[in-house]
């Protein structure tokens, strides 16, 4: 057992500690018990799964875009996105169709970049995949380009020499097919 009085009376020059009250502790300090660690090794992936389960209940969008899925949508595909224009009230729906230029994999913050030419002007639309504002994402054509692109980011499609075929005919065909269904 440590005796503070005996230690300070040794004459080793520790009187200044006594004056500051350090030697006045009668019993040793009891430290609190350590907090238990997380049950899972990768806490971040567990959090992402939980967020994804809330935002994407049937995990349709996860299967559509995640790298681990063999039948995922790849850049170059033609997509139709239906989103709510005034989100809390789900009255009106906006549609945007375009070529998929890029997929950003950032967990719950993953997003896609679509491009289309509207009235001669190139329009790009960056939208988060798991946003509750998006009603549905439909694949109109797996590969809208002539051959399969070998890049993850098709930024070269912005150049004027790469004229993309119009998407309007695919959108009209999709709308006609779905209007007749009850």
From Swiss-Prot:
Residues 1-21 form a transit peptide. It comes from the Eukaryota. InterPro entries: Ribosomal_bL19, Ribosomal_bL19_sf, Translation_prot_SH3-like_sf. GO terms for molecular function: structural constituent of ribosome. One of its GO terms (cellular component) is mitochondrion. Disulfide bonds: none annotated. Keywords: Mitochondrion, Ribonucleoprotein, Ribosomal protein, Transit peptide. GO terms for biological process: mitochondrial translation. It is found in: Mitochondrion. Pfam families: Ribosomal_L19 (PF01245). The keyword Amino-acid biosynthesis does not apply. Its main location: mitochondrion. Component of the mitochondrial ribosome (mitoribosome), a dedicated translation machinery responsible for the synthesis of mitochondrial genome-encoded proteins, including at least some of the essential transmembrane subunits of the mitochondrial respiratory chain. The mitoribosomes are attached to the mitochondrial inner membrane and translation products are cotranslationally integrated into the membrane. bL19m is essential for respiration. Belongs to the bacterial ribosomal protein bL19 family. Component of the mitochondrial large ribosomal subunit (mt-LSU). Mature yeast 74S mitochondrial ribosomes consist of a small (37S) and a large (54S) subunit. The 37S small subunit contains a 15S ribosomal RNA (15S mt-rRNA) and at least 32 different proteins. The 54S large subunit contains a 21S rRNA (21S mt-rRNA) and at least 45 different proteins. This is Large ribosomal subunit protein bL19m.
